[in-house]
Amino acid sequence: MAKIEFLNEITEIIKKRKLTQPENSYIAELVAEGLPKISQKLGEEAVEVVVAALAEDKARLVSESADLIFHLMILLDSKDLNILDVVKELDNRNKKWTSKN
């Protein structure tokens, strides 16, 4: 199973690009357009995941899923959250689920 520490690195990249707004930065451009645009892009990526699940191979599904998670990370950052907040929630749910068995 892959380790998830690299998610911290991606989170820091998102924060840095949001703060410094370098030229030619996709993250900076998306963040500058605001939450509605970030949300729209996340929705588009979600649709692409569904399409890949229904009509594409596994590699394409994994690729589109990575895009979805990346854009989710940008959205979470725009709400002063990060992916580790989601991981913690999943961990809490897992503890509840496993304690019931």
Per-region residue spans from a language model:
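Flexible "arm" and connector segments at domain edges
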Residues: 1-65, 69-101
